[in-house]
Amino acid sequence: MEVAALFPSACALPFGLILVDPQPPARNTGNPAAETVVRTARKAEEGAHMIGFQDLLDRREKIAVVGLGYVGLPLAVHLARHFDVVGYDLKAQRIAELAAGRDRTLEVSGADLAGSGIAFTHEPEALSACRLVVVAVPTPIDEHRNPDLSPLEGASETVGRHLAAGSCVVFESTVFPGATEEVCVPILEKMSGLRCGTDFTVGYSPERINPGDRVHTLDRIVKVVSGSDEPTAELLNAVYGRVVAAGIHRAPSIKVAEAAKVIENTQRDINIALMNELSMIFDRMDIDTIDVLEAAGTKWNFLPFRPGLVGGHCIGVDPYYLTFKAQAIGYHPEMILAGRRINDAMGAYVAQTLVKYLIREGRRVRGARVAVLGLTFKEDVPDLRNTRVVDIVRELADYGVEVLVHDPLADPEEARRYYGIELRSIEAIEGVEGVLVAVLHREYRTMGLERIAAMCADGRPLVFDLKGAFEPEDAGSRGIVYWRL
């Protein structure tokens, strides 16, 4: 049996074992992509010098960050303080904005962008000059809640076309255990004509960015690193160690690092699902959930989770990557999927509860005007991806309610394109039957309960507060009908 049959990916080879391709490099066909493969294959034949930390520190070699969103851009800025960095994104508009000093994610200031020294580009050819490539692209789910690896596969193809021998490719995107070696490595090998473990190496270091969090920033969160071999793990330990003051944790394998990332958010998802279920139970018992949690929280080992919508590109998505892999190997996960069902249904539950309150107050439902404050997936960020507020909007619309949505941070064009929602100005919201504070942006905290309630028409104001930002006693003293999760 051939060695290649025993080891489908050279990344799995025992240390020191080298695979030799008996086929000579293809002739020059005039196809630029094919010529790239030929050139890189010939470099491999000559023997590759693997990228070293000192090469990067002395700026003899460059680092590329592929994908300049909420994860990639802050990472690129931190790395650029110590290394030469190329920032690549396939969206020309995104590159133009960054070059002009504007970050629409609000994660990096204009001053930090201007002083970063990052070479921003949407030209993939620029990757050819980089020997350490960090891939930080989204890994969403599709309409069937299965992993959508197309952004990751596309990035791997792009990197592979321009991969130089001796390089290292490290992935930060959240994936199911095994994806780096089973999905990404074969693409890199195919597109480059190189062999993983012989001509290049790979690593995995899961992102832990929390959008909008100015306390738990990239440099203050322990970084997990892993490599396809020991030198690669050492390289990533050194590179990330330059930018992460909190410390580095070296996982024993890439699969361990992948699994660690996917369970971080799965654990949070399940705990929030428990709080959401408790909230629905206590609501039927006319018990305030937050009062219960505050009382229970006096015990030293009670975990401080709160009920709420679970959206965004992490917590509401990552569990499906794990359940997908579990089912692929013949195991049907019960608890994880149960938690997902509860959290995915919370938008409809909130909308239905609001409708009941309208009826209870003797107000119409069909034709009622309700204001929804906040559309992004979390407070103080402009990110609309996978926001669960849209579930509330759609459920209310199904009851015939006219929903007026306001968000001070969301891009109106994105809201229109993604969800068909027309954002309203705050001044245009008045005389409504009820107000639902869905996302507690700073603007709404500043407004306070009284000003929010003043948006309602004559009669007793109705305010729904998903984050529990206000006090029921204060609402009662002002004659406000108030509800919170």
What are these model-derived regions, one by one?
Residues 26:
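Extracellular glycan-interacting surfaces
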Residues 46-485:
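Structural/interface elements that position substrates and couple domains in central-metabolism enzymes
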